[in-house]
Amino acid sequence: MTNIRKSHPLMKILNNAFIDLPAPSNISSWWNFGSLLGIWLILQILTGLFLAMHYTSDTTTAFSSVAHICRDVNYGWIIRYMHANGASMFFICLYMHVGRGMYYGSYTFLETWNIGVILLFAVMATAFMGYVLPWGQMSFWGATVITNLLSAIPYIGTSLVEWIWGGFSVDKATLTRFFAFHFILPFIIAALAMVHLLFLHETGSNNPTGISSDTDKIPFHPYYTIKDILGALLLILALMLLVLFAPDLLGDPDNYTPANPLNTPPHIKPEWYFLFAYAILRSIPNKLGGVLALVLSILILILMPLLHTSKQRSMMFRPFSQCLFWILVANLLTLTWIGGQPVEHPYIIIGQLASITYFLLILVLMPTASMIENNLLKW
């Protein structure tokens, strides 16, 4: 008699994805982030579901309902802060996952990579709309500023913004629809993640060397299940340290002031995980140009397979490319810092230089370094 996990129609799918899956024997901890993202997504959906049971998406009661969750609901405060800080952990894993893909050349799996980029956009949209829901000052003004960017689109811009708002300003209709979208998108993300995994399992995982590992595979369970559990425990520990000791460390104090359309906060800024893109947006003195740069800063990932000029897949044996990659990481950290600073000298010029460097590194310097490395192989 065959094992039930290999014969049952549903169990068979799970078995082939998580138990008997042949995996490369040399994948490092950088390969943990895929499973961690899955765990965070489930955690965010669960905490979000419990928050939605008590939240009201009405401009008059939204702020109070969040206060009610924190004060009156059993363990409401921990659910709320796990959800808010869980988003930060989600983005840390997401950026590391994308960085891993860039470093080790995983973008050569075209379908997997492209769905990954769509997933990144979907998660960013979800996080943005979630930030609007508590209806504090930063929620309201963040929603106003970011949705207003669409008015830069020629001809249809203004109509588009008013259509998204459901009126002539960010108001009750906007909050209600943002709640609806914030609720449905994580389920769409979960479905996309399954498609992402489906395409990955068509080719099998990449590995640090970038060389085919077909000759040396090991079963996913128990080797990588135990490794993933360790990674998950470490990150859950980090999350709980954040939630229990410094729950507001990454938040904005302005969001503890109820939304007021008549009073603009001195510095409007998004959550830390959007600051790099926000810095790129602000560094261009033209509205449409800024919006295009903002979209392209993420959409540029789609071009990664086209910009790959090296004869080697991974950066493991390419010192010049490695150097440029870490300069890119430092550049993104600089942009993140600039995004949180006021628009004044010297931050403006630093932001502009960092923005130029960002696009220059990806579009020009890294492909050039790859070609130089190709020629060095002939020596």
Curated annotation (Swiss-Prot):
Q: Give me the residues that bind a ubiquinone, please.
A: 201
The Swiss-Prot or TrEMBL record annotates one GO molecular function as:
ubiquinol-cytochrome-c reductase activity
Membrane topology recorded in Swiss-Prot or TrEMBL: Multi-pass membrane protein
* Alphabetized InterPro entries for the sequence: Cyt_b/b6_C, Cyt_b/b6_C_sf, Cyt_b/b6_N, Cytb/b6-like_sf, Cytochrome_b, Cytochrome_b_C_euk/bac, Cytochrome_b_N_euk/bac, Di-haem_cyt_TM
Locations listed in the record: Mitochondrion inner membrane
Please report the organism this UniProt entry assigns to the protein.
Answer: Bubalus bubalis (Domestic water buffalo)
Q: Where does heme b b566 bind?
A: 97, 196
The name this protein carries in UniProt is Cytochrome b
Q: How does the cofactor bind to this protein, according to its record?
A: Binds 2 heme b groups non-covalently.
> Which Gene3D superfamilies does the UniProt entry name for this protein?
Cytochrome Bc1 Complex, Chain C
Query: What are the names of the required cofactors?
Result: heme b
Any remaining note in the record?
Answer: Heme 1 (or BL or b562) is low-potential and absorbs at about 562 nm, and heme 2 (or BH or b566) is high-potential and absorbs at about 566 nm.
Tell whether Metal-binding is among the UniProt keywords: yes
Write down any Gene Ontology CC term: respiratory chain complex III
Provide this UniProt record's keywords sorted from A to Z: Electron transport, Heme, Iron, Membrane, Metal-binding, Mitochondrion, Mitochondrion inner membrane, Respiratory chain, Transmembrane, Transmembrane helix, Transport, Ubiquinone
User: GO:BP terms for this protein?
Assistant: mitochondrial electron transport, ubiquinol to cytochrome c
Recorded family membership:
Belongs to the cytochrome b family.
Q: Where does heme b b562 bind?
A: 83, 182
Q: What is its main location?
A: mitochondrion
Which Pfam families does the record match to this protein? Cytochrom_B_C, Cytochrome_B
Q: Whom does it interact with, and what assembly results?
A: The cytochrome bc1 complex contains 11 subunits: 3 respiratory subunits (MT-CYB, CYC1 and UQCRFS1), 2 core proteins (UQCRC1 and UQCRC2) and 6 low-molecular weight proteins (UQCRH/QCR6, UQCRB/QCR7, UQCRQ/QCR8, UQCR10/QCR9, UQCR11/QCR10 and a cleavage product of UQCRFS1). This cytochrome bc1 complex then forms a dimer.
Q: Which gene encodes it?
A: MT-CYB
Q: Where are the transmembrane segments?
A: 33-53, 77-98, 113-133, 178-198, 226-246, 288-308, 320-340, 347-367
